[in-house]
Curated annotation (Swiss-Prot):
GO function term, MF aspect, one: metal ion binding
Organism encoding this protein: Sarcophaga argyrostoma (Flesh fly)
A single cellular component GO annotation: extracellular region
Family stated for the protein in its record: Belongs to the tyrosinase family.
Cofactor entry: Cu(2+)
Official protein name in the record: Phenoloxidase 3
Cofactor: binding details: Binds 2 copper ions per subunit.
Entry-linked SUPFAM superfamilies: Di-copper centre-containing domain (SSF48056)
Keywords, alphabetical: Copper, Melanin biosynthesis, Metal-binding, Monooxygenase, Oxidoreductase, Secreted, Zymogen
UniProt-listed Pfam families: Hemocyanin_M
Tissue distribution of the protein: Hemocytes and plasma.
Location relative to the cell: Secreted
C-alpha cells in the first residue's frame, strides 16, 4: 500500500515529496504492528489452539524461523 501511495519512481515529484512523509510511514507501520499485538489477534490464535503472540523486545536476539517454503 505504501509504495502505491508514494511510488519511488513517480513522474511528478510533488506526489512523493510530501511534508510529514516519515511520520505517515511510521504511523502506517505502527498500526500494522498494533494489529498483531491486539487482543483480537490473540483471540483468533487461541480459538485455533495456538499460543499467544510472544513480545519481541530484544533486537539482538535472532528470530526463530516459523516457515520454510523449500522443504
Amino acid at each position: 500500500h505504501w509504495h502505491l501511495v508514494y511510488p519511488i519512481e513517480a513522474p511528478d515529484r510533488s506526489i512523493v515529496d510530501k511534508d510529514r512523509r516519515g511520520e505517515l510511514f511510521y504511523y502506517m507501520h505502527q498500526q500494522i504492528i498494533a494489529r498483531y499485538n491486539a487482543e483480537r489477534y490473540n483471540a483468533e490464535r487461541l480459538s485455533n489452539h495456538m499460543a499467544r503472540v510472544q513480545p519481541f523486545n530484544n533486537l539482538d536476539e535472532p528470530i526463530a524461523e516459523g516457515y520454510f517454503p523449500k522443504m
